[in-house]
Amino acid sequence: MATDQGGGDMRGLVEQIARALVDEPEQVSVQAVDGEQVTVLELRVAPNDLGKVIGKQGRTARSIRTILSAAGMKLRKRFTLEILE
C-alpha cells in the first residue's frame, strides 16, 4: 500500500510541475502505470504545450526525470516519465 501512495505522490508532483510550466494547466493529466520494478508516469499536455514540457534539447524533461529519480530513491522505487502527445 505504501508503494501505491508513493506512486500517487509522484503523480501529483509531476502534475504540479507540469501545470506550472504550461499555458493550459487544465489539460495536464498524469497517469501512473505500476510495473514490477518501475512505475511509469504518463504525462499528457495540450499539443501546443508539448515544447514547454520538453524544453530546449530536452532539458526540462530531463530535469523532471532527475527530480523523479531523486524522490524515488527515498521511497526505494524507480519511476520513469513518458511524455505523450
Spans of features found by a protein language model:
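RNA-contacting regions in translation and RNA-metabolism proteins
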Residues: M1-L50, S63-E85
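Glycine-centered tight-turn and secondary-structure capping sites
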Residues: I54-G58
